[in-house]
């Protein structure tokens, strides 16, 4: 139950750049302070009772009509609500498109894309489920996956062979955020701007720098399910250290920030 609560808070408490969250352009249906849109998309990830459509629309299993179990790759019709306070898109109704309307899809060999959540990591492999894993050697040296990270895995399959061969791995989203404040530090873990999780076990820091509360920093972060957060910092660079006497000017500890997309 606690895990489901964390997922719910993570998916539905999402914060992102408004420019990043623009969905397909369809006719909107105004309703109060919300904007309803009907689109067709593809399920790109599913974890527990929550998932993503087209990597941009979050949904929970209770909005799927007929309680039909969903799988990655299924086409769906979606009624989408714009969550203005969090600059996000949330599905309020999901209808599965009957498979006979769009065919069975290719069954031969070829390159495909899988969206998955890291469940565990050892010295050699990264697991995104109990049965799907790949070598850590194919991951870019600039990015070290961590448990909870959401990854886009490009892989190939061959007829008659049940396992997959991953050819590339990258985070599904990477954002660069400038001049944000470290709001808490507890042991080896901390939070930036109340929304971005970090751990000293997996973050790039300048030599000799130790993150402290009230430090103003630039951050590179990836989408990741971490407790009640959906962003994980993979790089932290100090702009103003709290020990230097920096004080905010009434901004309540939340300096103005600028976000832009950045690929890894």
From Swiss-Prot:
Tell me one GO biological process term: spermatogenesis
Q: Which UniProt keywords apply?
A: Cell projection, Cilium, Cytoplasm, Cytoplasmic vesicle, Developmental protein, Disease variant, Flagellum
One GO CC annotation: cytoplasm
Keyword Cell cycle (UniProt): no
InterPro entries, per this entry? Answer: NA-bd_OB-fold, S1-like_RNA-bd_dom
Main localization category:
cytoplasm
Which segments show compositional bias classed as Basic residues? 254-264
Give positions of region: Disordered: 242-264
Compartment(s):
Cytoplasm; Cytoplasmic vesicle, Secretory vesicle, Acrosome; Cell projection, Cilium, Flagellum
Source domain of life is Eukaryota
- Function description: Plays a role in spermatogenesis, possibly acting in the regulation of the autophagy pathway.
Q: Which PANTHER family match?
A: CANCER/TESTIS ANTIGEN 55, CANCER_TESTIS ANTIGEN 55
Protein name as it appears in the record: Cancer/testis antigen 55
């Amino acid at each position: 139950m606690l895990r489901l609560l964390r997922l719910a808070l993570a998916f539905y408490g999402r914060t992102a750049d408004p420019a990043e969250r623009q969905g397909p352009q369809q006719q909107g249906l105004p309703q109060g302070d919300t904007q309803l849109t009907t689109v067709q998309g593809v399920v790109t990830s599913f974890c527990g009772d929550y998932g993503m459509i087209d990597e941009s629309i979050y949904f929970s299993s209770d909005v799927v009509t007929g309680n039909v179990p969903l799988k990655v790759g299924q086409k769906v019709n979606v009624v989408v609500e714009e969550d203005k306070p969090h600059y996000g898109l949330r599905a309020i109704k999901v209808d599965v498109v009957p498979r006979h309307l769009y065919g069975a899809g290719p069954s031969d060999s070829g390159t495909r894309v899988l969206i998955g959540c890291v469940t565990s990591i050892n010295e050699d492999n990264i697991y995104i489920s109990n049965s799907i894993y790949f070598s850590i050697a194919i991951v870019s040296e600039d990015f070290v996956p961590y448990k909870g990270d959401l990854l886009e895995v490009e892989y190939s399959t061959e007829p008659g062979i049940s396992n997959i061969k991953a050819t590339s791995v990258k985070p599904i989203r990477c954002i660069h955020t400038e001049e944000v404040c470290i709001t808490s530090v507890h042991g080896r873990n901390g939070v930036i701007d109340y929304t971005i999780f970090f751990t000293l076990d997996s973050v790039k820091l300048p030599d000799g720098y130790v993150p402290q509360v009230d430090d103003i920093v630039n951050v590179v972060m990836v989408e990741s399910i971490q407790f009640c957060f959906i962003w994980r910092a993979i790089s932290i660079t100090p702009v103003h250290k709290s020990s230097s006497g920096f004080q905010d000017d009434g901004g309540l500890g939340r300096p103005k920030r600028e976000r832009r997309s950045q690929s890894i």
